[in-house]
Amino acid sequence: MTIDRTYPIFTVRWLAVHGLAVPTVSFLGSISAMQFIQR
């Protein structure tokens, strides 16, 4: 019966993980792109 309390936490945690993962992937992608452009 704790679905109402667990679901919002899971949603916030899911949004936080994606919110941190997307900028990290784009940041690593830009670094790798700069490395390939320099070489």
Swiss-Prot record:
The keyword Thylakoid applies. Heme binds at residue 18. Pfam families: Cytochrom_B559. Its main location: plastid. Keywords: Chloroplast, Electron transport, Heme, Iron, Membrane, Metal-binding, Photosynthesis, Photosystem II, Plastid, Thylakoid, Transmembrane, Transmembrane helix, Transport. Its cofactor is heme b. The keyword Metal-binding applies. GO terms for molecular function: electron transfer activity; heme binding; iron ion binding. Coiled coil: none annotated. With its partner (PsbE) binds heme. PSII binds additional chlorophylls, carotenoids and specific lipids. The chain crosses the membrane at residues 14-30. SUPFAM superfamilies: Cytochrome b559 subunits (SSF161045). This b-type cytochrome is tightly associated with the reaction center of photosystem II (PSII). PSII is a light-driven water:plastoquinone oxidoreductase that uses light energy to abstract electrons from H(2)O, generating O(2) and a proton gradient subsequently used for ATP formation. It consists of a core antenna complex that captures photons, and an electron transfer chain that converts photonic excitation into a charge separation. Heterodimer of an alpha subunit and a beta subunit. PSII is composed of 1 copy each of membrane proteins PsbA, PsbB, PsbC, PsbD, PsbE, PsbF, PsbH, PsbI, PsbJ, PsbK, PsbL, PsbM, PsbT, PsbX, PsbY, PsbZ, Psb30/Ycf12, at least 3 peripheral proteins of the oxygen-evolving complex and a large number of cofactors. It forms dimeric complexes. This is Cytochrome b559 subunit beta. It comes from Arabidopsis thaliana. The lineage of its organism: Eukaryota, Viridiplantae, Streptophyta, Embryophyta, Tracheophyta.
